[in-house]
């Protein structure tokens, strides 16, 4: 291995290893493409500080170069002025820093397939690299950047890179961005690029969507639509509330009107009932009497033959005995017995029996030509003293055993009280009428003045 030093007279190396002087540009080269691993080199700071220095792997650009210098045969005391065969090297495990070459505007970091060196493992901050405007970051496929190197997981932030107006964030498929680099999982914040007017955020399936200005406009439009919807709902609610209030008021008015009409209806019904009762009373008072002649012409039969006699007030016979009483009446009055509904009044013997017999003898002497008729009268309740109702309807099931008369020939006269049928009936004038009918002991028709002794009802 030869070590060539250009740019001045060769000087002897000292016993101890010294650093390479950074006064001139220096370069390491090896014969035959390089040898193995010089261990005497502790730092390449001077080499990296040179503007024209380049670091590359064995298969990249440059001359013969050398690979993996891990050892050295002789120390370097002077600086290397220039390099005839600028070689490349890869995998600098002994390099402590790469600050100076990264500060160079033309510096570039690439993988083993392009220019430069690949997969640097030494930890150094990429802030200086990211500050440089032409600096490009790319994946190991070399898309979207000039040099192209894989995503650096040791990068702490992308604030300075993302503050660039032309910065763009895209997914690993390279859509939606100009240069297209994969999504950086180590990016902690995207505040600065999102605030940039020209920034674009894409999901990788389309060419990106509108800027934040468009998103804000769309959001404002949605807010306006929501406000309009809420305003319409509020107006609808107010309208429904007003309608409900009007309906409730109308319902209360209808309820009060119904109560008023019910009260008026009750009052009118009471007045109508009073008027009808008054009309019935007037009609019953002004009704003409029903003449017996009309009933006789219609063929009606008397229910009984009643004879008023003071003998009705005498002592009643024992129960179960029905003995007739012989009464003497005038012949003219006796002839009226055949008239239906005939009532015979026998002038009462209101004195003692002896006086009555004497008075009767005198009357016989006075009325020799007129004559008298004796009539047998029975008390009320005796057999054959009232006409049979079933016989009047057509046929009586009892036949000859019936206790009621089956015709005028079987009808017997009945002794009545002296005041029988002399007073008007109070129940007959009522609207319901008298429940006793023809058996009532009170008069149901007005008494004729002409009938003093005998009259028909």
From Swiss-Prot:
Signal peptide: none
Keywords (A to Z) from UniProt: Coiled coil, DNA-binding, Metal-binding, Repeat, Zinc, Zinc-finger
Region (Disordered): 51-73, 102-130, 195-221, 280-329
Composition-biased stretches (Gly residues): 57-66
Entry superkingdom: Eukaryota
MF (Gene Ontology): DNA binding; mRNA binding; zinc ion binding
Keyword Mitochondrion: no
Coiled-coil segments on the chain, per record: 215-276
Zinc fingers classed as C3H1-type: ranges: 382-409, 419-447
PANTHER family, per database record: CCCH ZINC FINGER/TIS11-RELATED (PTHR12547), ZINC FINGER CCCH DOMAIN-CONTAINING PROTEIN 47 (PTHR12547:SF150)
Protein's UniProt name: Putative zinc finger CCCH domain-containing protein 21
Organism in which the protein naturally occurs: Oryza sativa subsp. japonica
């Amino acid at each position: 291995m030869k070590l060539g030093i250009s740019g001045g007279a060769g000087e002897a190396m000292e016993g101890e290893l010294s650093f390479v002087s950074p006064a001139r540009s220096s370069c390491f080269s090896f014969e035959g493409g390089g040898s193995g691993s010089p261990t005497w080199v502790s730092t390449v700071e001077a080499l990296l500080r040179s503007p024209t220095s380049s670091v590359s792997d064995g298969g990249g650009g440059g001359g013969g170069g050398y690979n993996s210098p891990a050892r050295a045969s002789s120390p370097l005391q002077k600086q290397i002025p220039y390099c005839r065969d600028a070689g490349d090297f890869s995998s600098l495990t002994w390099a402590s820093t790469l600050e100076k070459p990264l500060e160079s505007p033309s510096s570039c970091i690439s993988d083993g397939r392009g220019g430069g060196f690949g997969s640097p493992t030494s930890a150094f901050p990429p802030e200086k690299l990211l500050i440089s405007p032409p600096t490009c970051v790319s994946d190991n496929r070399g898309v979207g950047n000039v040099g192209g190197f894989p995503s650096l997981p040791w990068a702490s932030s992308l604030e300075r890179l993302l503050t660039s107006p032309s910065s763009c964030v895209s997914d690993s498929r390279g859509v939606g961005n100009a240069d297209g680099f994969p999504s950086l999982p180590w990016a902690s914040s995207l505040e600065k690029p999102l605030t940039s007017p020209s920034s674009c955020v894409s999901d990788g399936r389309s060419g990106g969507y509108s800027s934040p200005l468009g998103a804000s406009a769309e959001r404002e439009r949605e807010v306006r639509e929501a406000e309009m919807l809420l305003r319409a709902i509020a107006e609808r609610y107010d309208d429904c509330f007003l309608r409900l209030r009007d309906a409730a008021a109308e319902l209360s008015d209808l309820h009060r009107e119904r109560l008023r009409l019910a009260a008026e209806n009750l009052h009118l019904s009471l007045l109508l009932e009073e008027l009808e009762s008054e009309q019935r009373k007037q009609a019953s008072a002004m009704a003409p009497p029903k003449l017996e002649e009309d009933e006789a012409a219609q063929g009606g039969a008397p229910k009984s033959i009643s004879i008023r006699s003071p003998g009705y007030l005498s002592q009643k016979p024992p129960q179960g005995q029905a003995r007739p009483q012989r009464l003497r009446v005038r012949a003219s009055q006796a002839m009226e017995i055949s008239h239906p509904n005939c009532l015979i009044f026998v002038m009462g013997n209101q004195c003692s029996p002896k006086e009555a017999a004497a008075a009767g003898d005198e009357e016989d002497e006075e009325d020799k030509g007129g004559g008298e008729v004796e009539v047998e009268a029975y008390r009320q309740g005796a057999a054959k003293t009232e006409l049979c109702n079933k016989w009047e309807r057509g046929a009586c099931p009892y036949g000859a055993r019936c206790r009621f008369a089956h015709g005028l020939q079987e009808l017997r006269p009945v002794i009545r009280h002296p005041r029988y049928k002399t007073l008007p009936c109070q129940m007959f004038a009522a609207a319901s009428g008298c429940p006793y009918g023809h058996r009532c002991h009170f008069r149901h028709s007005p008494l004729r003045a002409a009938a003093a002794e005998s009259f028909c009802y």
